[in-house]
From Swiss-Prot:
Catalytically driven reaction(s): di-trans,octa-cis-undecaprenyl diphospho-N-acetyl-alpha-D-muramoyl-L-alanyl-D-glutamyl-meso-2,6-diaminopimeloyl-D-alanyl-D-alanine + UDP-N-acetyl-alpha-D-glucosamine = di-trans,octa-cis-undecaprenyl diphospho-[N-acetyl-alpha-D-glucosaminyl-(1->4)]-N-acetyl-alpha-D-muramoyl-L-alanyl-D-glutamyl-meso-2,6-diaminopimeloyl-D-alanyl-D-alanine + UDP + H(+)
Keyword Cell membrane appears in the UniProt entry: yes
Gene: murG
Lineage of producing organism: Bacteria, Pseudomonadati, Pseudomonadota, Betaproteobacteria, Burkholderiales
Annotated binding of UDP-N-acetyl-alpha-D-glucosamine, by residue: 15-17, 127, 163, 191, 249, 294
SUPFAM superfamilies: UDP-Glycosyltransferase/glycogen phosphorylase
Protein name: UDP-N-acetylglucosamine--N-acetylmuramyl-(pentapeptide) pyrophosphoryl-undecaprenol N-acetylglucosamine transferase
Length: 367
């Protein structure tokens, strides 16, 4: 580390929705010569994922209270004090020029200590409904950034930082115009499998005449792939040239770009990625998400005619089959173009620029 090299500390953990956008910003800052250190939970996914990206880590142990018993709640003051002490030690070791909070439970104690020690804090909220931690810290932060307009008062709308390849896909007009034949459907269940989609989609496709059925790529997570295959077979559909069942998709940018329509949940990063690529989507929000934020995430696109929103309680094979019959490549292309128009493809650069500016530096060029 040179005497002029600046340091960014990223605070994020718990879920991919916090970690992956943090990684996008971290890589952007590293490309500009910044030193980046990550503050996370040793029990979180970040403890395994972040070091693989060549980013050193500091650790804070702190968890949430939702669904926990009385013992955990009574221990909160002790756990909070311990987390604050761990955060203070980490900040003293790293001496960051600016701290970026991307969410996760550890952001609360670490964010408080950041402010109390006089270091500049930048917050980024990924969801359309801010969590309690960010609602509190937003009143103390130097700059507050949001992925969805209106998520926090007096915040700057930057969008969600995404991987570079997603922001560089060919525009939807060109992609859709070059296609002919059957529609291409991508179903994304994520690592958890989205059991509702795994059950309804095969039955809906079975209700369509063979010439009405789209080509399907259905991703379901390794633990659910055998059950998914059974669901398709029970619906009378065999895997072959028109149905591909996969446990994982390595290249999501290509998967989105090759699809005419995506059926999926509406996590913050999924919505951001679909808009960035520009692809038609039918969102089925996870009904048990905190504060039902997946519904409001999906509404951001659906209210502009850039996606369709169906609640899981309303989703049926008959409803989905009827809706699919009414779609054409032209109608889906129009939806995709509206989605792309609402994207924030430069979100990674914007968040990185804010961090640099708060530290009194400039960021050059674009990723």
């Amino acid at each position: 580390m040179t005497s002029t090299q600046r340091t960014l500390m990223v605070m994020a953990g718990g879920t991919g929705g916090h970690v992956f956008p943090g990684l996008a910003v971290a890589h952007r800052m590293q490309a500009q010569g910044w030193r980046v250190v990550w503050l996370g939970n040793p029990a979180g996914m970040e403890a395994t994922l972040v070091p693989r990206h060549g980013i050193p880590m500091e650790y804070v142990r702190f968890g949430g209270l939702r669904g926990k018993g009385l013992a955990t709640k009574f221990a909160l003051p002790f756990n909070l004090l311990r987390a604050c002490a761990q955060s203070l030690r980490a900040l003293r070791r790293v001496k960051p020029d600016v701290v970026l909070g991307m969410g996760g439970y550890i952001t609360f104690p670490a964010g408080l200590v950041t402010v109390l020690t006089g270091r500049p804090l930048v917050l980024h909220e990924q969801n359309s409904i801010a969590g309690l931690t960010n609602k509190v810290l937003a009143k103390l932060a130097k700059r507050v950034l949001v992925a969805f307009p209106g998520a926090l008062p007096n915040a700057e709308w930057t969008g969600n930082p995404i991987r570079t390849e997603l922001a560089r896909t060919e525009p939807p007009q060109a992609r859709y115009a070059a296609r002919s034949g059957k529609l291409r459907l991508l179903v994304v269940g994520g690592s958890l499998g989205a059991a509702a989609l795994n059950e309804v989609v095969p039955r809906a496709l079975a209700l369509l005449a063979p010439d009405e059925r789209p080509q399907v790529v259905h991703q379901a997570g390794a633990k659910h792939i055998d059950t998914l295959k059974e669901n398709y077979e029970a619906a009378g559909l065999s895997c072959g040239s028109d149905v591909a069942l996969v446990p994982f998709i390595d290249d999501m940018a290509s998967a989105y770009a090759n699809a005419d329509l995506v059926i999926c949940r509406s996590g913050a990063m999924t919505v951001a990625e679909i808009a960035a690529v520009g692809v038609a989507a039918l969102f089925v929000p996870f009904p048990h998400a905190v504060d039902d934020h997946q519904t409001t995430n999906a509404e951001f696109l659906a209210e502009q005619g850039a996606a369709v929103l169906v609640q899981q309680r309303d989703l049926s094979a008959e409803l989905l089959a009827d809706w699919l019959r009414g779609q054409s490549r032209d109608s889906l292309a129009a939806m995709a173009e509206r989605s792309r128009s609402l994207a924030k493809p430069d979100a990674t650069d914007e968040v990185a620029r804010v961090c640099a500016a708060v530290a009194g530096a400039n960021l050059e060029g674009k990723q």
